[in-house]
C-alpha cells in the first residue's frame, strides 16, 4: 500500500524543471524520483504549460506514462482569483453558463454534491442552487449552505465572476466532469474556481 500524505497530492510541493519560457508561453516538467515512487509507484513525466493569448490564459497538463503497464492518476488545478484592492468578495456575482441539465432539473438551477470530509466528490446530492438568468450574487452567508459547491455531470460549460455586471474572470470548464466553487470569505480575499 502507498499513502498520499495530503489530499492535494505531491506534485505541488515539488520543484519543476523549466522546459520552455518565452514571451507568451511557459512549460515546466516534473519526473518521478525515488521520493515520488515511495508515494506513487509509477514512472511518469508531468508537464504543465501556461499560454497567454491576448486576455486569455490557457493552462495545459500533459501526463506521460513512462512504464508499459496501466498508470492511475488524477490531476486538477487550484486556481484562486484575488479580489481587487478596495473591493469585497460580496461585490461579485457568479454567472454560470449551462451545458446540460439532470433529469427533472430546471434550467435556472444547478444541483450540487456533498463533498466528503476530505473534500472529494461523494456522489451524494446535497442541494440545488437557484439561479436567475444563470446568475447568483455572492452574498454574505452564501457558503453557509455548502462550504464548497461541487457541480457534477458537466452541468457548467463556463463560470464567470462578474464585478459591476462585467466579467472580472471567466473560466471555461467544458472538458471537466466536476467544478468546485469555494472561498475562505472571512479570512482570505479570493474565490476559487476549480474544474
Which residues does each predicted region cover?
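Short, well-ordered beta-strand segments enriched in hydrophobic/aromatic residues
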Residues: 48-50, 57-65
